[in-house]
A protein has these predicted regions:
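Acidic, Gly/Pro-rich loop/turn segments at junctions of secondary structure
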Residues: 1-89
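Hydrophobic residues within well-ordered alpha-helices
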Residues: 2, 52, 98-102, 117
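A conserved hydrophobic position in a structured secondary element of the catalytic/binding core
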Residues: 34-35, 90, 108, 157
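Short, hydrophobic alpha-helical packing/hinge segments within bilobed ligand-binding/sensory domains
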Residues: 92-96, 113
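C-terminal effector-binding regulatory domain of bacterial HTH transcription factors
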Residues: 110-119, 123, 129-168
Length: 168
């Protein structure tokens, strides 16, 4: 658990897992579903979440997230879709590279894929559906909450993220 580790500040995407640490949200962040245009030309573009079951989805094992299940929300309706594919990793950069190479659809943080979406190397799919948030948090042990160096660093991060946009 984070609370047992010796660290000053940890950066985390998504909800903090441990109530024994201080978590400050430093930036909003969405997860997006995207694929290379070549993949979508070959396999078609999913129109509904259930269509994902017939696609190659690139799996990313992260923390306690349910592996192989993607949660998508439109309005008040949330669907949990069991996805599958030949490729999975615990490294988000590798997963994005596989998507860029046309191997399937990936769910990844907007900060990781924004430049590829802008350039057209990736295309967002099911854009009308929301995925679970992956807001960016600075996490630090309670014993550091009064440390000036920790406060200064976390304030710096929050200011930096506030003046940046995903992919820049």
């Amino acid at each position: 658990p984070l609370a047992a580790d010796a660290f000053d500040v940890c950066i985390r995407f998504g909800e903090p897992p441990d109530a024994r640490v201080i978590a400050r949200r430093i930036a909003p962040n969405r997860r997006l579903l995207c694929a290379a245009p070549a993949y979508l030309e070959r396999r078609g573009t999913p129109k509904l979440p259930s269509d994902l079951a017939r696609h190659d989805c690139i799996g990313i094992r992260q923390g306690d997230d349910a592996y192989g299940q993607w949660r998508l929300t439109a309005g008040r309706k949330t669907e949990v879709v069991k996805v599958r594919g030949a490729l999975s990793t615990n490294d988000g950069e590798i997963a994005v590279n596989w998507a860029l190479d046309g191997h399937g659809i990936v769910m990844r943080a907007e900060w990781d894929v924004a430049r590829y979406l802008r350039s057209g190397r990736l295309v967002q799919v099911l854009a009308d559906h929301q995925t679970p948030p992956a807001d960016i948090y600075a996490i630090y042990p309670q014993r550091h909450q009064t440390a000036a160096r920790v406060r200064a660093f976390v304030d710096f991060l929050a200011e930096r993220f506030a003046t940046s946009s995903p992919g820049h």
